[in-house]
Regions:
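Short, hydrophobic/amphipathic alpha-helical patches that form generic packing surfaces
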Residues: 33-40, 99-107, 135-142, 160-164, ...
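C-terminal accessory domains and tails appended to enzymatic cores
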Residues: 29, 59-60, 75, 84-91, ...
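Short helix-capping/linker segments at secondary-structure and domain boundaries
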Residues: 41-45, 106-115, 168-172
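Sparse, context-dependent recognition of short Cys/His-centered cofactor- or disulfide-binding micro-motifs
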Residues: 17, 49, 122, 206, ...
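An N-terminal structural lobe/cap that precedes and organizes the functional/catalytic core
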Residues: 4-85
């Protein structure tokens, strides 16, 4: 099997890119993550060599965090040279090996692992990995991750510190190389799970956007499963003439009815366009079951009135329950 690394400047296949070089000795999060990214992209055919030998580095196809050269056309990704000043776009965070590899190969890795994503979703996921993983790792590697607490130097617990803990007493021993590859395997698993989770989230966001568009004229958004609807609903209400007041979705054999904030400003994060009837707030168990909304028995209502559950058999019954909430609010307005 031949796996391709592709970017705007060069294409390399595993038939010629079997060897990835990084430095030996003490290892850090930036080159372990970078090696993990490349290993996931190239697959089982990749061969990782840890060395500082200039001749070996010169003959390698891909070299990261070693060699004193950054040249994407030559697949050289070091950041230690004095003239290197590249930063993560829009920030002052200097790039290290993790960010450099992700900059050039992240999109290719995402499309390989998640071909179901469209171009915009790939861009969003790339940005998420860059912000969540690469920037903090590079920040730490370049010495920008230290902050002061009550006048003393302190560091947050970071993935960089986790990686550093694997270093052996003799950093040039075979055990050090074995430890490095253990970290790479751990990071590969983390990267796979992070990408899977974020890709799934993007798909759910897309489903939510489609549901909102399809029901734009309604005051009740009815979902056939829970979706991360908040962003899509607030955008529709603010920019697309939407008038959504409530959302309802199935949950564990019942239907939840949830309020929608006035807008997406921080001060209105917990606001409610329409609140559930105050007479229901905090009800649970037998007390709740004595009440109903639109013909569906109440299961519970949160004490702040932002969420309730009803025993509705169908989506239409849940809609009627939500519409009853709106009608009661209008009657008291």
């Amino acid at each position: 099997m031949t796996t391709s690394i592709e970017n705007t400047q060069t294409t390399v296949t595993t038939s010629t890119a079997k060897t990835v070089i990084t430095h030996n000795g003490l290892f850090h999060a930036d080159e372990t993550f970078g090696t993990a990214f490349l290993s996931l992209l190239l697959g089982s055919e990749v061969r990782v060599v840890r060395t500082r030998n200039p001749q070996v580095i010169e003959e390698a196809c891909v070299a990261l965090d070693v060699g004193g050269e950054y040249d994407n056309a030559k697949l050289r990704y070091d950041h230690h040279q004095r003239e290197f000043t590249d930063v993560h776009e829009g920030t002052s965070v200097k790039l290290a090996a993790c960010g450099l590899i992700w900059r050039h190969f992240g999109t290719c890795l995402i499309t390989k692992l998640h071909p179901e994503l469209d171009i915009e979703q790939v861009k969003t996921l790339w940005q998420s990995v860059d912000e969540t993983i690469c920037r903090p790792v590079d920040l730490q590697d370049n010495g920008q991750g230290t902050f002061k607490v009550e006048g003393a130097e302190a560091q947050a617990l970071t993935v960089s510190m986790m990686v550093a803990a694997f270093n052996q007493q003799d950093i040039y021993s075979p055990a050090q190389d074995e430890a490095f590859m253990r970290v790479v395997e751990i990071l590969k698993e983390y990267i796979l799970n992070f990408l899977r989770s974020e890709a799934n989230k993007l798909q759910l966001l897309k489903e939510a956007e489609e549901a909102v568009k399809a029901q734009l004229g309604s005051r009740v958004l009815v979902l056939d499963k829970f979706l991360p609807y908040r962003e899509a609903v607030l955008k529709a209400n603010a920019e697309e003439g939407g008038q959504f007041d409530l959302v309802t979705y199935p949950a564990q054999g019942q239907w939840n009815i949830q309020t929608i904030p006035v807008d997406d400003t921080p001060e209105n994060f917990y606001s409610q366009r329409v609140s559930l009837p105050q007479r229901l707030w905090g009800l649970t168990g037998p007390d709740a079951s004595k009440e109903s909304l639109g013909g569906s028995a109440l299961v519970f209502c949160h004490k702040t009135g932002f969420l309730a559950a009803v025993k509705a058999d169908t989506a239409e019954a849940a809609r009627k329950a939500a519409e009853a909430v709106i009608a009661e609010a209008q009657a008291k307005a």
